[in-house]
Regions:
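Bacterial Sec-dependent N-terminal signal peptides
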Residues: 14-36
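Active-site SXXK
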Residues: 75, 92-117, 144, 203-207, ...
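Catalytic-site signature segments of enzymes, centered on catalytic residues
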Residues: 88, 156-246
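Active-site helix/loop module of the DD-peptidase/beta-lactamase fold
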Residues: 111-151, 182-184, 211-246, 250
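Structured C-terminal helix/loop/strand segments within mature extracytoplasmic catalytic/sensor domains
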Residues: 315-362
Length: 362
């Protein structure tokens, strides 16, 4: 029995990490599939293989609570590691969905004449009975994208296990859009950042109404089918409103594709799916929060005194797509750290600063 247990635990290491005759550490090149991703070896792309293998050992030892990690360098997938068998499958990407909603907003703006300064009230004539006073009528599409609507909303300050979290109250409501837009105002639109998944849902409904098709149809025709994405589900409420704040499920490789799409200015396999202008605009600070753009987060990593700017998609529990253009890096993490979302980010950030960036700059 002891021998069988040792074989089970050692085989993953032997599969992905080996040594040549001169004791050089070798990472196995990720599998080349027909999904549009091109693979290469870490060594061929100039990364420090020994440092990356040390990182993998640390994760396998349980120090970072990571389910999977994928790294692309110079547009090549050079590392693909799964630390749970289930992590190879479809992952609920949580609020990473918001960044995909941002991409669809860009398509609606560039191709369907959606205007950022359009008041939200214009899209919902059936909700004219709501109280639109106290500047609520001034909320625009731009305010939705920057999480600065001014609507009263308590989400990030409470655990998602707390029944009083407005995100949970939203899920219990019969009409998501009316529940969100019926909230009273707590500040002027554009003045205060307040994380609100409801705004992403309202944004998704606006995109659907502006393009005269469902978010599901738009995402498949404009993005997913062109990127060979294994689209599984996008949850909706009973009336058909899409959960564009956190309802998508992807394979980790499909998450990586989305990061590569943005790193390449909206181009995937030679086709311009998003305008370069929108990619730049949506990943640059636009509102009152220095760390937030249009449904993308912003971060700086400092390694050996050098600062590397990045933008990233962040989903509850440790789902990340991180793009560091200066180093031509795209990094994907999946995890299940739902009890402490900030710890999940800290774990991933430590891997980036201690291993991934150093391995890429040597």
């Amino acid at each position: 029995m002891t021998k069988r247990i040792l074989v089970i635990f050692l085989l993953p290491l032997l599969t992905f990490i080996s040594c040549s005759d001169d004791n050089e550490v070798v990472l196995e090149t990720p599998l080349q599939k027909s999904d549009g991703i091109i693979t290469s070896s870490a060594k061929e792309q100039g990364l420090n293989v020994k440092l990356l293998s040390t990182m993998i050992d640390e994760i396998r030892a349980g120090h970072y609570s990571i389910n999977s990690i994928l790294i692309a360098k110079n547009n090549y997938l050079i590392l693909e590691e799964y630390f749970l068998e289930s992590a190879k499958g479809i992952t609920a990407i949580q609020s990473v969905t918001k960044s995909i909603t941002s991409a669809l907003a860009g398509i609606a703006i560039d191709e369907y004449n959606l205007l950022l300064d359009t008041p939200v009230i214009n899209f919902f004539p059936e909700l004219s009975h709501l109280d639109w006073s106290n500047e609520k009528e001034l909320i625009t599409v731009h305010n939705l994208l920057t999480m600065s609507s001014g609507l009263q909303w308590n989400e990030s300050a409470l655990s998602y296990n707390n029944p009083q979290n407005d995100h949970n109250l939203l899920n219990q409501s019969d009409n998501w859009i009316e529940f969100i837009l019926s909230r009273p105002m707590s500040s002027s639109p554009g003045s205060v950042f307040n994380y609100n998944s409801g705004l992403s849902i309202v944004l998704g409904e606006i995109i659907g109404r502006q393009t005269n098709q469902s978010i599901g149809q738009l995402s498949i025709s404009k993005l997913f089918s062109k990127m060979d994405t294994e689209f599984v589900s996008w949850s909706t409420e009973n009336s058909g409103v899409y959960q564009t704040g956190g309802g998508l499920s992807f394979l980790p490789r499909d998450m990586l594709k989305f990061g590569l799409l943005y790193q390449n200015g909206g181009v995937w396999n030679g086709e311009q799916l998003l305008s370069t202008g929108w990619v730049l605009q949506s990943t640059t600070q636009q509102g009152p929060n220095m760390e937030y753009a249009y449904h993308w987060w912003l971060a700086s990593f400092t390694v050996d005194g050098q600062v590397y700017e990045s933008f990233y998609a962040w989903g509850n529990g440790g789902q990340f797509i991180i793009v560091i253009n200066e180093l031509s890096l795209v990094i994907v993490f999946t995890a299940e750290n739902f009890e402490d979302n900030l710890l999940a980010r800290a774990n991933s950030w430590k891997l980036i600063t201690d291993y991934i960036i150093p391995s890429s700059v040597e």
